[in-house]
Amino acid sequence: MTEKMNVESFNLDHTKVKAPFVRLAGTKVGLHGDEIYKYDVRFKQPNKEHMDMPALHSLEHLMAELARNHTDKLVDISPMGCQTGFYVSFINHNDYDDALEILATTLTDVLAATEVPACNEVQCGWAASHSLEGAQALAAEFLAKRDEWKNVFGE
């Protein structure tokens, strides 16, 4: 990695981070002054472990639906292609600690869920690939290490 790349995460040394963590990955200001804050919510250690797709997929559905019960500032929750985490974006919400609280409350809701929202062929592009139990296990594991979320490099 010698030259700066256009994608922020490609400039992050993935061998130096220690999951789990939540870091501000970038900000963008729109033409009318709105600010987007994108967080890297890393569940698994890069290049060492990953989330199984059915569990990740269900966790995406659950977080996308349930987080909106706690904030109107959420723009999107997007899974990473490497299956190690999610990008979570907020608009006009620059309070990192509150973002962590929204995540924690949402993941606590995941633990109480009895079904995966929109887990059907009408509302989902791969409805056969879901696991409520897997999503809940991921949420429980991440919540159990909440004291590590701010420590991106394990120092």
From Swiss-Prot:
It catalyses: S-(5-deoxy-D-ribos-5-yl)-L-homocysteine = (S)-4,5-dihydroxypentane-2,3-dione + L-homocysteine. The keyword Iron applies. PANTHER family: S-RIBOSYLHOMOCYSTEINE LYASE. Its cofactor is Fe cation. Binds 1 Fe cation per subunit. Homodimer. One of its GO terms (molecular function) is iron ion binding. Keywords: Autoinducer synthesis, Iron, Lyase, Metal-binding, Quorum sensing. Belongs to the LuxS family. This is S-ribosylhomocysteine lyase. One of its GO terms (biological process) is quorum sensing. Fe cation binds at residues 57, 61, 124. SUPFAM superfamilies: LuxS/MPP-like metallohydrolase. Involved in the synthesis of autoinducer 2 (AI-2) which is secreted by bacteria and is used to communicate both the cell density and the metabolic potential of the environment. The regulation of gene expression in response to changes in cell density is called quorum sensing. Catalyzes the transformation of S-ribosylhomocysteine (RHC) to homocysteine (HC) and 4,5-dihydroxy-2,3-pentadione (DPD). It comes from the Bacteria. Transmembrane segments: none annotated. Its EC number is 4.4.1.21.
